[in-house]
Amino acid sequence: MDFETWLQLANAIIVARTGMDRESFPDWYWWNAFDDGLTFNEAVDMFLEDLYSGRL
């Protein structure tokens, strides 16, 4: 899967689960997760954990 498709899927899940605006997400976060080989589901779970714990 290419990065753009991966990013669209991850963003759609975040918007659906949090109601946040897409522009609220840091792009560097997604690049790092993609480069680390995470699936978009793993990246979303990690993002939400970091968001709700205050790390973001």
Task: Annotate each language-model stretch with its function.
Residues 1-56:
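C-terminal alpha-helical interaction appendages
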